[in-house]
Amino acid sequence: MAEITAALVKELRERTGEGMMDCKKALTKAGGDIEKAIDDMRASGAIKAAKKAGNVAAEGAIAIKDDGKAAVIIEVNSQTDFLALQDDFKAFVAASVEKAFADKLTDVAPLIEAQEAARLVLVGKVGENVNIRRLKRIEGDVVGTYLHGNKIGVVVTLKGGNVELAKDIAMHVAASNPEFLFPSEVSAEAIEREKNVFLQLNEDKIKGKPAEIVEKMVGGRITKFLAEASLVEQAFVKNPEVKVGDLAKKAGAEIVSFTYFKVGDGIEKPVDNFADEVAAQLAAAKQ
């Protein structure tokens, strides 16, 4: 059995983030074999992770890796925004997106599998649930990206143009979050729904007006709706006098696609009861 030195305990602590006593116990159990101790602690972390797996992870970060021709965008969730700002979480996210890009992954499942051991170590260290939620790989003639505070990520592909233009348009998408690329993509159902909403909201204004006037009013609202909902018709955030579609055309480019990720989109967050939370903390303190 190898001697359990202070240096060995320190190394294990630095590599796992566990407490000094836990590291010493793990090394003793592993006979001084640090790699076996890490494996044992991972197994212990897996138990902790299983307990945390039911906790909703709705915070986190978006990460992007690109080279101008291809990009990978991922979302990694944590339970708290505080953890999302910590170095250990950031390192896990960075390693995950690097892996996804290097392996040219197009589905999140292989990334989840590849990063599971590291995830378990992280969960065991930080004490809250962490999940790799989604991934998308995008390739194109020109690919530009924009990341806003690690909370919103956008990838834009162009035919023609250059990366800087694609990045500018990606920044616009991050700010405006369009639903569609072109007006033609807006469904007839969505237009009809918008029309009905307009008529209901303006019932008093249109009452008694000729049908042709009402039709013009509705047409104006639908035109505005299409401009607001489709990227190419939106006013460019850096120059509102120019539409995004015209900006691309002027540069000899065509917008092919955009991808928008926002942390927590579609995740139902639990509503915390502050009184219950305090009571639970007091009960735990008495144990």
Curated annotation (Swiss-Prot):
The keyword Kinase does not apply. The keyword Protein biosynthesis applies. GO terms for molecular function: translation elongation factor activity. Residues 80-83 are annotated as: Involved in Mg(2+) ion dislocation from EF-Tu. It is found in: Cytoplasm. SUPFAM superfamilies: Elongation factor Ts (EF-Ts), dimerisation domain, UBA-like. Keywords: Cytoplasm, Elongation factor, Protein biosynthesis. GO terms for cellular component: cytoplasm. Belongs to the EF-Ts family. Associates with the EF-Tu.GDP complex and induces the exchange of GDP to GTP. It remains bound to the aminoacyl-tRNA.EF-Tu.GTP complex up to the GTP hydrolysis stage on the ribosome. This is Elongation factor Ts. The gene is tsf.
